């Protein structure tokens, strides 16, 4: 079992070494790629490093140097991997950005991080048209040529002599911005040493990746989860990464899993939920799949049961955050307790603590916290030491999530700190109610929040997306309420249900319960007025 010291990188270290070592193995396949039209391409590790070195040399010729920060906004294309590797091998810093960002988002990042350049896929350049600070940057495109942007891949550069920068484990590698509940996004500083610790933590024990595996992790570049799995865990293990450059369609995903004989699969709970509802699952042969994991939010028991029944695979949960790594998970050899988050990952000191910073007793709900000495914890919030202080309690960094631990050390998720519902003195976690609701065949997805109530303080309110929106009715409301009462404690049932066509979500597909809570507060305030 891994210990903390096993997660500490050598003092002189560059994470690209983890991938580059596989380029010596002849034509070992690094990446398989397909887009919506069916076009296919593949790169070996040797080809990947050739492209990496060419891009790195081109960036050096343009005047970039160690420590410079570059915004990278690229989709699921093979060049994304080479761009990231080139920047990191150069000792520079990647700022991952989603194409969903708007001008104000980009302006903040450019100013706050003192960005020197931007590498952007041609289809996304429009996002920079209204960015007032874009003229300060060296702007480089990938794909079609665009006026005012230099095409990075067309630059003639000799990569044969491109060398790895002299970096240490404490040098910044990534600056990832993550939303806070208030104020501007937080700039999360990850070092090369963090990448080493993350790779050791997640690739083997959780994802269960070996060199011979074909791995599909569905996250897109621009998000920390892409850095976690498709980039670090897959390439750092010498495996073959499958990349699908297309929109999510549940049936299409199942067809690709079947056709490419995927061995390891990692996707969001939302994607699993929608795949589980596809009719005729017996059409798909997923016998090559030996590992399936989910991260982002707890996965419903019913979905886990569907994959077990039809494909003989146990979907295992994992929990982490932008600031850290896989902190808690159902590891490959850990007995599954349905509904549990699993146990803390080896080498990472993760606890549940109370308001005094003391470790909670089994069964006591507290804050999930990471010891500050954990190697896979981020270095700091960039230029924001005060925000860092607000999330430290004693020797621990607070994740913002609450849970309880049982006698065997399994963690059981309760809620985000601000998602907990207190109704008539009862403490209710929204996930339990949501998990019950989605077991009903008419429910596609749902979100549960607190709604202000003069008598009870708050009541449980459910926003429900139906499989068929035309079936909404008062009768169905009563059916769903009774359904929940039969599955979980009756006091937890949703006293109000509202049918909606969609739920508000973050760009990474997490439900924005905070938006729904604010809506409820406003609605109740208007009724009082």
Curated annotation (Swiss-Prot):
ATP binds at residues 178-186, 401, 416, 510. It comes from the Bacteria. PROSITE patterns: AMP_BINDING (PS00455). One of its GO terms (biological process) is fatty acid biosynthetic process. InterPro entries: AMP-bd_C, AMP-bd_C_sf, AMP-binding_CS, AMP-dep_synth/lig_dom, ANL_N_sf, Mitochondrial_ACSM. Signal peptide: none annotated. Keywords: ATP-binding, Ligase, Nucleotide-binding. Its EC number is 6.2.1.-. One of its GO terms (molecular function) is CoA-ligase activity. It holds the Pfam family AMP-binding. Belongs to the ATP-dependent AMP-binding enzyme family. PANTHER family: ACYL-COA SYNTHETASE MEDIUM CHAIN FAMILY MEMBER 3, ACYL-COENZYME A SYNTHETASE. NCBIfam families: AcylCoAsynMbcS. This is Uncharacterized acyl--CoA ligase YtcI. It comes from Bacillus subtilis (strain 168).
């Amino acid at each position: 079992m891994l210990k903390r010291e096993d997660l500490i990188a050598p003092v002189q270290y560059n994470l690209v070494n983890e991938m580059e070592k596989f380029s010596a193995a002849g034509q070992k396949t690094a990446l398989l790629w397909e887009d919506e039209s069916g076009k296919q391409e593949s790169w070996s590790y040797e080809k990947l490093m050739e492209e990496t070195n060419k891009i790195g040399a081109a960036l050096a010729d343009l005047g970039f140097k160690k420590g410079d920060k570059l915004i990278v906004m690229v989709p699921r294309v093979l060049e994304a991997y080479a761009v990231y590797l080139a920047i990191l091998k150069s000792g520079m810093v990647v700022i991952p950005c989603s194409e969903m960002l708007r001008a104000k988002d980009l302006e903040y990042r450019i100013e706050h991080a003192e960005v020197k350049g931007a590498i952007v896929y041609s289809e996304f350049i429009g996002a920079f048209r209204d960015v007032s600070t874009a003229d300060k940057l060296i702007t480089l495109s990938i794909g079609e040529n665009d006026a005012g942007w230099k095409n990075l891949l067309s630059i003639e550069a000799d990569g044969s002599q491109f060398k790895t920068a002299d970096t240490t484990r404490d040098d910044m590698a990534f600056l990832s911005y993550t939303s806070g509940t208030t104020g501007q996004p937080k700039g999360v500083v990850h070092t090369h040493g963090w990448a080493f610790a993350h790779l050791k933590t997640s690739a083997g024990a959780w994802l269960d990746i070996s060199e011979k595996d074909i791995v599909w992790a569905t996250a897109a570049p621009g998000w920390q989860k892409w850095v976690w799995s498709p980039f670090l865990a897959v390439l750092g293990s010498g495996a073959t990464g499958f990349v699908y450059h297309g929109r999510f369609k549940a049936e299409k995903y199942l067809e690709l899993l079947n056709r490419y004989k995927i061995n390891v699969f990692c996707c969001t709970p939302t994607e699993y939920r929608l795949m589980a509802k596809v009719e005729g699952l017996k059409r798909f042969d997923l016998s090559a799949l030996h590992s399936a994991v989910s991260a982002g939010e707890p996965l419903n028991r019913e979905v886990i049961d569907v994959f077990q029944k039809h494909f003989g695979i146990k979907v295992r949960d994992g929990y982490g955050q932008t600031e850290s790594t896989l902190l808690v998970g159902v590891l490959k050899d850990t007995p599954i307790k349905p509904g549990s988050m699993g146990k803390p990952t080896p080498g990472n000191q993760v606890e549940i603590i109370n308001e005094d910073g003391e470790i909670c007793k089994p069964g006591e709900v507290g804050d999930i916290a990471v010891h500050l000495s954990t190697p896979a914890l981020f270095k700091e919030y960039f230029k924001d030491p005060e925000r860092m202080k607000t999330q430290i309690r004693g020797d621990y960094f607070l994740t913002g999530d609450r849970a309880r631990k049982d006698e065997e050390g399994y963690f059981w998720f309760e809620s985000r700190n601000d998602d907990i519902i207190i109704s008539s003195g009862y403490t209710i976690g929204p996930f339990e109610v949501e998990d019950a609701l989605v077991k009903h065949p008419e429910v596609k997805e749902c979100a549960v929040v607190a709604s202000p109530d003069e008598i009870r303080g708050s009541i449980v309110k459910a926003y429900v997306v139906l499989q068929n929106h035309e079936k909404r009715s008062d009768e169905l409301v009563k059916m769903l309420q009774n359904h929940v009462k039969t599955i979980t404690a009756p006091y937890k049932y949703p006293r109000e249900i509202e049918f909606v066509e969609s739920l508000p979500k973050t760009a990474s597909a997490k439900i924005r319960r905070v938006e729904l809570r604010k809506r409820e507060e406003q609605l109740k305030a208007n009724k009082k007025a």
